């Protein structure tokens, strides 16, 4: 298990072997062998609730393999870190970005729709896949609104948007068939 600083305690509580938990600070990396590394990178959020607020680090991750760079943005708001990561790690093959459960009151911890395309452009990833949507209702927007913003993202950037169905395997080296757009986000 690779996680940001202080989060390992939660994995221990859930029964994970402490010897198999690696905590990383921003810009630290863990070598996994055979040319694979995981690097913890900045994100913009907070951690914990109540009395345990902000006692652990939040982060994003870059998985580098011999053939690919995959950026996992995690749960977080827009910030200058996207441009910095894009500059430091050019040629990202896939960026997994948050798109959903947003609200103007949470704009510093959840990426807003108008910021999604900007973050994608700054990262410079060839392909984008969004997460953090269509599963539960935390925000006031419709459950399918984030899927509509994806259509705008695809039209507004040079990156290819992956829109897999739940459970679908999408090989990175092959194009994905077009899916329904904003007028029919369910694909039905």
Predicted feature locations:
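Conserved beta-strand segments of alpha/beta enzyme cores
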Residues: 20-22, 37, 160-162
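Short low-complexity, flexible loop/linker segments enriched in glycine and/or proline
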Residues: 17-18, 37, 143-145, 177-179
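Short beta-strand scaffold positions
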Residues: 2-3, 73
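Short, structurally constrained coil/turn elements
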Residues: 15-17, 32, 155-157
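Cap/insert and terminal regions of metallo-dependent hydrolase folds
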Residues: 3-12, 79-166
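Structured beta-strand-rich core segments of catalytic domains in phosphoester-bond hydrolases
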Residues: 6-7, 18, 33, 38
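Core dinuclear metal-dependent hydrolase active-site scaffold
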Residues: 24-90, 166-188
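Helix-loop-beta element that forms the nucleotide-linked donor phosphate-binding surface
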Residues: 11-23
């Amino acid at each position: 298990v690779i996680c940001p600083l202080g989060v390992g305690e939660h994995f221990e509580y859930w029964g994970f072997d402490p010897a198999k938990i690696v905590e990383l600070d921003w810009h630290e990396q863990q070598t996994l062998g055979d040319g694979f590394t995981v690097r913890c990178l900045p994100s913009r959020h907070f951690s914990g609730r109540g009395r345990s607020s902000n006692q652990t680090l939040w982060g994003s991750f870059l998985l580098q393999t011999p053939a690919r760079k995959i950026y996992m943005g995690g749960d977080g708001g827009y910030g200058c870190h996207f441009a910095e990561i894009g500059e430091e790690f050019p040629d990202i093959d896939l960026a997994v970005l948050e798109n959903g459960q947003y609200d103007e009151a949470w704009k510093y911890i959840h990426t807003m729709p108008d910021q999604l395309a900007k973050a994608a452009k700054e990262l410079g990833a060839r392909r984008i896949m969004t997460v953090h949507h269509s599963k539960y209702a935390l925000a006031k927007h419709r459950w399918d609104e984030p899927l509509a913003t994806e259509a705008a993202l695809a039209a507004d950037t040079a990156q290819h948007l992956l829109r897999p169905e739940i459970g679908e395997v999408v090989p990175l080296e092959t194009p994905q068939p077009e899916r329904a757009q904003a007028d029919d986000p369910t694909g039905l």
